[in-house]
């Protein structure tokens, strides 16, 4: 089986070679192309190219029809009719040029006859800078040189090395571009001063060139191997006593070391003679990662430096921290007794930390008392306490590593925004480039000279995931009124920026919101509640998630329209505020269903609308439309009713129009204790007017009351008699017991009934006329038996007389004396006399009080 496969392979190779030979032969079967003087010429030389046809290879055996054409690549340069063609070509460029001869028997077809390649080149230049090198003690010798310009021809380079004792080593380079050769021999270190000579020869078709001989010794050409097994050791873990160690070849006498912190670009260089693989370093920084490299040389003056060793990266030991922390704080009131103090500090730099910071020690102490001290140890860069609002407090923060602690940074806790005169003015924040935010402000006017330092702080405006956003700050000298924020800032995030001006323990501040980049929010606010309050609605909403706000929100818009309405919605634009997330709207009509939604706006545009909510205002109509008329009517009514005359007339009208069933029950004086003990005098007995006037002197304060009967023609008038014992206003009179005789006489002798007659004299208060006899009175002195009822005894002096009084005297003797009194007459001229029906009755034995009505000076029977 193996023999069969081998035989097939050889047969295939033979067939391929036969085809190639036949193709070679068949290329120029119609003619030949010759080149004179050579196929290889130097630059600028001329060449003669000839093309001839072989016998019986022309066009139909007629030579006049043969047209030979010479092409240079694909461009026609010469043609001639006949069996041959000859042309001289000059100005050929460097490199190889192809010429092709073709036969044209017609204008449509050309037959290839043969072709030739002409190479144009130059004589090789003399090789320069021949140098040889041997890598390590056991390496081989390799030499390199500069070839010079390109010959554009195949050029062979030969390296020859001659040594002591007529030793010669030679090697030729077969590559087209050859500039180095490895002889594959090792020069022994036993004879470091022995001389060697190297020479390079270049040969091509146009000529030969040789380099100058290069002579060297073993020390000149040997290049030690790079050091290896590099390590560093520090005694007692102290950075001040660190030793770098490595391994080298035995012939090395000189070393050079370079090292640097990994974050630095410049190297520190150190030379070490006869170091024997170790060197002490005294200027290393603590807790710093360094990169170390070492190179070697076999001789102080001669020889070559080895390549740099592989880098060793290691961290030096720690040392106690140096420097002080940059501490900042925030103060927030919780209630009237407590406040919250939040301390923040920045990390120390690597050069200041000098080790891994394990924790921070924080102390908060009341300055005045000195006994209230709070201490804590934390690994974070912030701490928060709740302390009383009274007293002056100070804080101290220090950092600690495994070797010790830094000096504490002490600050006094003051109101950072308490001094209004120190507040910076015209604060602005604008993007600067693509990654920076430029904050500018102006000095605080009168307090500018007192400013010792500016502090610019910024933090994300919105909480993410319920966590407090980190606080960042920068300090600026008092002569600067701008700063560039580039750390801890991201695009499409809104930041609250505050500028503090500090002067001792006082400070003033101003704030603004800013963003690095912004675009329209991705979603709108979510309305979570709509409530009705006093004829208006209160809309409450949830904040847009921070990752969807896409910058600082400038305004909110509330849209509303009637449900199922195609009209344009109304809107209300609200400036952004952190809290509360609610706003009233008082322009909605009651009992109309509205659809409401909200959007948010940044400087880049408006967000999509949020959720829709329907609401119908169920409150009463707008009460404000009734307030003004009600106030006017009330003022007019109060003004009119302040006039007594008008008030009395209106009251009488209301009494006349009032239905009988709603009449007020009037107390009956006849049922009183006084009426039972002291019955009224008999009506038929006539009182002697002369005796009555003699016994009644003029009262000190007469209070006449006119009682008018509402009749078309008759108005009875009663006159109040004067009596020295008449009680003052508001006093009660003690009744007198009547004798049995008078009582019996009154009951048994009723007078004949008669009508009341009008009287032109002054009116008398009817209730004050009513009286009783004294217990010691006699029939001959009836006037002395009368006791006047006070006006205050009745429920009201403007109401009716009691309706259930037993009787009134059916007639009264006329009183004609001119008494000193104050007449009062009220005319009901606003009502026609026939509007009220006159009361007609027949006088019987008694006149009941339920037939008599009194009010505002009028008596109606």
Curated annotation (Swiss-Prot):
Signal peptide: 1-23
Positions in the Extracellular compartment: 24-622
Name of encoding gene: IL12RB2
Domain Fibronectin type-III: 126-224, 226-317, 318-415, 423-520, 521-620
Glycosylation sites: 48, 129, 166, 271, 347, 376, 480
Superkingdom of source: Eukaryota
Classification via Pfam families: fn3, Lep_receptor_Ig
Location of the protein in the cell: Membrane
Chain spans, region Disordered: 718-761
One example of a Gene Ontology biological process annotation: positive regulation of cell population proliferation
Modification sites for Phosphotyrosine: 800
Modification after translation (UniProt): On IL12 stimulation, phosphorylated on C-terminal tyrosine residues.
The protein's name in its UniProt record: Interleukin-12 receptor subunit beta-2
Domain notes per entry: The WSXWS motif appears to be necessary for proper protein folding and thereby efficient intracellular transport and cell-surface receptor binding. The box 1 motif is required for JAK interaction and/or activation.
All ranges on the Cytoplasmic side of the membrane: 644-861
Location of the motif WSXWS motif: 305-309
CDD domains linked to this entry: FN3
Biological function: Receptor for interleukin-12. This subunit is the signaling component coupling to the JAK2/STAT4 pathway.
Family according to the record: Belongs to the type I cytokine receptor family. Type 2 subfamily.
Membrane-spanning segments: 623-643
Subunit structure: Heterodimer/heterooligomer; disulfide-linked. The functional high affinity IL12 receptor is composed of I12RB1 and IL12RB2. Il12RB2 binds JAK2 (via its N-terminal) through a membrane-proximal region of the cytoplasmic domain.
Membrane topology according to the record: Single-pass type I membrane protein
Alphabetical UniProt keywords: Disulfide bond, Glycoprotein, Membrane, Phosphoprotein, Receptor, Repeat, Signal, Transmembrane, Transmembrane helix
GO CC aspect terms: external side of plasma membrane; receptor complex
MF term (GO), any: cytokine receptor activity
Motif (Box 1 motif): 662-670
Gene3D superfamilies with a match to the protein in the record: Immunoglobulins (2.60.40.10)
